[in-house]
A protein has these predicted regions:
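Juxtacatalytic substrate-recognition/specificity segment
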Residues: 2-130, 215
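Acidic/His/Gly-enriched intrinsically disordered linker/tail segments
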Residues: 84, 112-116, 128-245
Length: 245
């Protein structure tokens, strides 16, 4: 399945690639190393994180094949062109940037690629620490990754919908966000940001490490109604979001 790939190893990182994508190996490795160091410190890991294996695949067909057969993640085939990365345990399948123009909706950007790898590394770390990752709400997992990777600061897909919602006084309810994958990416990070701003990083770590049933609000000690009202008020007055507009 992956026998035909070339491999680059450095410390606890292993990157698979084909020859035409060799030019992306170093930046992939460096970004993974930086992400592991940064977020191991954030999540207060007491021991070294296990080795991570990333595979740069050359096209959409190979991406779908490895996601299904190697990672055992059931996705639509052919997958949506907005899918360019899929983590599972300590493996990460990445559509190589050389295939973006033909097989994705994205244009390659060095900075956005680094933030993407940070985003996916957060998913890997969350799965490693979580008592039951399958129960984790999508808004929480994606919100955590968008927030800590700082994609929300620089990428319009995550920031603009929130700015528009604030300005038009149409911020969705959390139940609505949970039911809509798109809203999970757009608004999940604002909920995580509010939690960290209000309750501190210790609460983020508590949720990641102890939320086994998916009830984030039980861990916080708030009803969803009370929490939602305070979060929406926070958004209306959160200047930092506008500072990056």
């Amino acid at each position: 399945m992956i026998e035909s790939y070339l491999w680059f190893n450095e410390e606890n990182i292993k990157v698979g690639f084909i020859e035409k994508d060799r030019k992306f190996v170093k930046e992939t490795t460096v970004a993974l190393k930086e992400a592991i160091k940064l977020f191991s410190e954030y999540f207060l890991l007491e021991k070294s994180f296990p080795p991570i294996r990333a595979i740069l695949v050359p096209n959409r067909k190979e991406y779908d094949h490895l996601v299904k057969e190697l990672l055992k993640v059931d996705i639509e085939r052919p997958s949506n062109p907005n899918r360019i990365a899929q983590p599972q345990r300590t493996d990460l399948v990445l559509l190589a940037p050389s295939a973006y123009s033909t097989d994705s909706i994205y244009e390659y950007s060095v900075k956005e690629y680094k933030r993407l790898i940070f985003h996916e590394t957060i998913h890997i770390l969350e799965e490693y620490l979580s008592p039951n990752i399958e129960a984790s709400p999508r808004w929480w997992g994606e919100g955590l990754a968008v927030y800590l990777s700082e994609q929300w600061k620089y990428e319009d897909d995550f920031r603009v919908p929130v700015l528009e919602g604030i300005r038009s006084n149409s911020i969705p309810e959390i139940e609505e966000i949970q039911k809509d994958v798109r809203l999970c990416y757009q608004y999940g990070w604002t909920i995580v940001k509010y939690i960290e701003s209000t309750y501190g990083r210790k609460m983020i770590l508590n949720i990641v490490k102890n939320c086994a049933d998916g009830d984030v609000f039980d861990i916080i000690g708030e009803t969803i109604g009370n929490f939602e009202g305070e979060w929406q008020k926070y958004l209306q007055n959160e200047k930092e979001i506008f500072n990056f507009a």
